[in-house]
């Protein structure tokens, strides 16, 4: 199974992936951001901007790596990464589904204030990139079709992991 955990920056994607990895047999966390850094970092300029999803190779490389890790290495994979574009969902997750891989999308949601406060708690400062783009990430991730939405406001990691496991079963 491949489980993509989306939502705005600071909503708890990585924290919840870490909470799930010990509860899902033979699972690992896949860092799609590292793929994005590699793709974008090898261009002498940023021809497609700063959003990884705008780089055509980002979708293709994630698709290929996830497919290989699942089919040839046998892993269940957790991917904590904001998806902003339906097109990215289609190019990665829908293709994996068409290949017969059980693929799920969980979309975490929280109020602006909750996300803002969580970003500050992890050590970021006002005016940082993720802080400046909270609304873009909230709106973009909430419009991607094909996922199960989970509200995270006022809930513990344990409560959210339990709900996620129920959704995945």
Spans of model-derived segments:
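Conserved phosphate-donor/acceptor-positioning beta-strand/loop module used by diverse small-molecule
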Residues: 99-119
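ATP-binding Walker
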Residues: 11
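Small-molecule kinase domains that catalyze NTP-dependent phosphoryl transfer to phosphate-bearing small molecules
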Residues: 121-163
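Conserved substrate/cofactor phosphate-moiety recognition/catalytic segment
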Residues: 18-62
